């Protein structure tokens, strides 16, 4: 309609809207409601990236799109991108994280270990089973900053009963330049 066309023309990110529409069209879920969802979303660029990743992997469905809208767009994009880069983005893995109560920290952990070259299905499952997500994220962050995030150090951190002291010791070493 003329109204939809004008919405795209006046949108602050029209290219993101057009690409999102294309992904919807290609997967058969282009509806007025979905258009309104992306048009009104506060992060259209991240939504476009999420839709692109889901479309590339054959996972762009109405249900997955709706679950993405319930998440922070930057966190879900970071999560999907990390898994996609190492070819472990599957519907099962998406569902595991989609329902995780701490998507923000999980997505950051995945980004750290993906950038370190140690994101595997096994390591992904270890991260999901971890109870102390925030201390794990901090420990991995400090290891990454020090250039010490390796598979061996990742396993050492995971094997500790108390991760918080590990994170603190890494922070103190980093602050002291040691």
Regions found by a protein language model. Give the residues of each.
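Ankyrin repeat (ANK) tandem alpha-helical domains that serve as protein-protein interaction scaffolds
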Residues: 1-178
